[in-house]
């Protein structure tokens, strides 16, 4: 298994997709809305991906809830992370967050999808890229809700990915469109944004982490996703994290400062990433596969899902029915809240 995660073109694999998936550097596939028509088609696409690859790949998606939910029709309408604490008492917020983590993960596992890149652990809502994807502006509240969400994901059989280390919440720029810079003192980032990552690592609740394509100017001129300081010195050595480190998508503008696609891939792997995402740019992905030295990434097998239930079994279960009802209701309440309704 190799360290490259990439995407496929449409609802089913074409000849080029199949050729790419056989490459020994490929270790994963990430799915997008363009890959989804309905649940039966999605399940068949995942089957095709499994059949086309030499080894079992890590199949992933961003199914956070709120505005980041790639699969909608036939799946529960998941609330944005902010909704849990914003609209409920603390005990109810924690209960619903646990059910939200379980439901999201269980619905994906029933499609034979290994991981959804969640939860978002960024603090605060002012960032254009993050906004309602953050659990809360208070680090302690965000930690409590995140722990419940993680407990739910783990109980379904899915590994969790905390993002975007060391924290994307304080920058207004969107790293999909530009390279954001965070000029705050390191002490502030450590005391505020990093607190949640540190606590969850100490409690061994994070299986993987995705760093931010953000330059923290007081620490390193490189984005955190390509920074040995953040990934090796801080995350591995200081915090003792021994899980998987993903790069965020190397096609994002936030990664462009690291050079060409092969240069970005090399920089992120050398900085300490275990798996690199190259999405929505097939030419860039192929150039990485053509130019990257052979790398094995067998540790990625830790990310395979542990569920063994079918979609029918899930939808017939009492827990799914109750969770679906509660989370759909919370999504509707959150939308009404954003629209200014009582």
From Swiss-Prot:
* One Pfam family in the UniProt entry: Glyco_hydro_3
InterPro entries named in the record? Beta_hexosaminidase_bac (IPR022956), Glyco_hydro_3_AS (IPR019800), Glyco_hydro_3_N (IPR001764), Glyco_hydro_3_N_sf (IPR036962), Glycoside_hydrolase_SF (IPR017853), NagZ_Beta-hexosaminidase (IPR050226)
Keyword Cell cycle tagged: yes
Question: What EC number(s) does its UniProt record assign?
Answer: 3.2.1.52
Recorded coiled-coil stretches: none
Q: Which domain of life is it from?
A: Bacteria
Q: Which GO terms describe its molecular function?
A: beta-N-acetylhexosaminidase activity
Name the positions where substrate binds. Answer: 62, 70, 133, 163-164
One Gene Ontology term of the biological-process aspect is: peptidoglycan biosynthetic process
What's any one GO cellular component for it? Answer: cytoplasm
Places the protein is found: Cytoplasm
The active site annotation covers: 176 (proton donor/acceptor), 248 (nucleophile)
Keywords assigned: Cell cycle, Cell division, Cell shape, Cell wall biogenesis/degradation, Cytoplasm, Glycosidase, Hydrolase, Peptidoglycan synthesis
Report the top EC class in one word: hydrolase
What pathway is this protein a component of?
Cell wall biogenesis; peptidoglycan recycling
Reactions catalysed, as given in the entry: Hydrolysis of terminal non-reducing N-acetyl-D-hexosamine residues in N-acetyl-beta-D-hexosaminides
What positions are marked as the site Important for catalytic activity?
Answer: 174
> What is the recorded function of this protein according to its Swiss-Prot or TrEMBL entry?
Plays a role in peptidoglycan recycling by cleaving the terminal beta-1,4-linked N-acetylglucosamine (GlcNAc) from peptide-linked peptidoglycan fragments, giving rise to free GlcNAc, anhydro-N-acetylmuramic acid and anhydro-N-acetylmuramic acid-linked peptides.
Tell me the protein family, please.
Answer: Belongs to the glycosyl hydrolase 3 family. NagZ subfamily.
Q: State the protein's name.
A: Beta-hexosaminidase
Its gene is nagZ
């Amino acid at each position: 298994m190799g360290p490259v995660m990439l995407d496929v073109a449409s609802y089913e694999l074409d000849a080029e997709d199949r050729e790419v998936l056989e490459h020994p550097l490929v270790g994963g596939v990430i799915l997008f809305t363009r890959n989804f028509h309905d649940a039966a088609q999605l399940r068949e696409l995942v089957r095709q991906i499994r059949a086309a690859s030499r080894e079992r790949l890590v199949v992933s998606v961003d199914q956070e809830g709120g505005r980041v939910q790639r699969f909608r029709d036939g799946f529960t309408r998941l609330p944005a992370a902010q909704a849990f604490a914003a609209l409920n008492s603390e005990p109810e917020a924690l209960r619903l967050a646990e059910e939200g983590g379980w439901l999201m993960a269980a619905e994906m596992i029933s499609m034979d999808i290994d991981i959804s890149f969640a939860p978002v652990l960024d603090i605060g809502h002012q960032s254009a890229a993050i906004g309602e994807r953050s659990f809360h502006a208070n680090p302690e509240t965000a930690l409590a809700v995140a722990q419940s969400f993680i407990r739910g994901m783990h109980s379904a059989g899915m590994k969790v990915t905390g993002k975007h280390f060391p924290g994307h919440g304080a920058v207004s720029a969107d790293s999909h469109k530009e390279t954001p810079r965070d000029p705050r003192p390191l002490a502030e980032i450590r005391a505020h944004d990093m607190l949640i990552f540190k606590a969850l690592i100490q409690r061994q609740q994070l299986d993987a982490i995705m760093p931010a394509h953000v330059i923290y100017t007081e620490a390193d001129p490189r984005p955190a996703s390509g920074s040995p300081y953040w990934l090796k010195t801080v995350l591995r050595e200081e915090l003792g994290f021994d899980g998987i480190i993903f790069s965020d998508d190397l096609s994002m503008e936030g990664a462009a400062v690291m050079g060409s696609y092969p240069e970005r891939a090399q920089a992120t792997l050398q900085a300490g990433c275990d798996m690199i995402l190259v999405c929505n740019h097939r030419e860039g992905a192929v150039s990485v596969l053509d130019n990257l030295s052979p790398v094995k990434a067998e540790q990625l097998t830790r990310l395979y899902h542990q569920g063994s239930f079918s979609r029918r079994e899930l939808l017939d279960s009492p827990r799914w029915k109750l969770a679906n009802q509660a989370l759909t209701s919370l999504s509707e309440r959150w939308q009404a809240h954003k629209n200014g309704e009582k």
